[in-house]
């Protein structure tokens, strides 16, 4: 075999080895190129999946009394909530077991979200102060019943009743869930101070122990 043939055969072998090596590199590196993002969006809690609820006409839930300032009210039988008077204002009255414990000087009245900019905050009262936030109609308006499986939307707020002892309200990036045994608050990722805290994870159902942000 002459030198030219040897060089040609060696060149073909080198190209074949290079092709095999490139294919192996793609096979090894392929999964890394298609891997899922490290920070996937949190799942939407069932409390805020509106496809599970029947919307109601908000008209009968809005008080026309001047003293109620256009607010919308409802009761679940266990919880009393109100929407308004401005866009994305909502509050629910009551204290789940994980709310701040009452003391001789203060007790928890409920929680509220303000214009989707602050909250949920606990609304508390005490011997030396009273909150500016007021629960319930000032008139004789009787809040209608929002039933299990229904949703109510008014003034940029949507509330649902997943179960007889549970209520959930969302303004956008903020939300609250009340049950007798626990509460869960949601707020935007950028907000580190404008809200009250959630209970320790062990007090929440497993499906809600993760993120405090909504998708």
Where are these regions (language model features)?
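Secretory targeting and sorting signals
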Residues: 1-40
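A low-complexity, Ser/Thr/Gly/Pro-enriched, surface-exposed linker/loop concept
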Residues: 41-63, 88-146, 182-215
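Polybasic (Lys/Arg-rich)
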Residues: 179
């Amino acid at each position: 075999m002459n030198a030219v043939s040897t060089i040609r055969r060696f060149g073909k072998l080198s190209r074949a080895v290079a092709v095999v090596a490139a294919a192996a590199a793609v096979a090894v590196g392929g999964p890394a190129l298609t891997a899922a993002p490290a920070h996937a969006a949190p799942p939407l809690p069932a409390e805020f999946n509106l496809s599970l609820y029947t919307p109601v006409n908000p008209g009968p839930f809005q008080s026309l009394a001047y003293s109620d300032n256009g607010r919308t009210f409802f009761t679940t039988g266990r919880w009393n909530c109100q929407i308004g008077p401005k866009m994305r204002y909502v509050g629910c009255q009551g204290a789940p077991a994980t709310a701040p414990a009452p003391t001789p000087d203060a007790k928890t009245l409920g929680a509220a979200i303000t214009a989707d900019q602050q909250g949920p905050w606990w609304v508390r009262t005490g011997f030396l102060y009273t909150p500016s936030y007021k629960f319930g109609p000032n008139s004789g308006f009787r809040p209608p019943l929002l039933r299990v499986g229904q949703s109510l939307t008014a003034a940029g707020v949507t509330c649902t009743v997943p179960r007889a002892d549970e209520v959930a309200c969302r303004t956008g990036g903020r939300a609250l869930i009340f049950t007798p045994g626990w509460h869960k608050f949601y707020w935007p990722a950028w907000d580190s101070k404008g809200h009250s805290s959630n209970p320790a994870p062990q007090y929440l159902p497993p499906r809600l122990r993760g993120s405090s942000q909504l998708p």
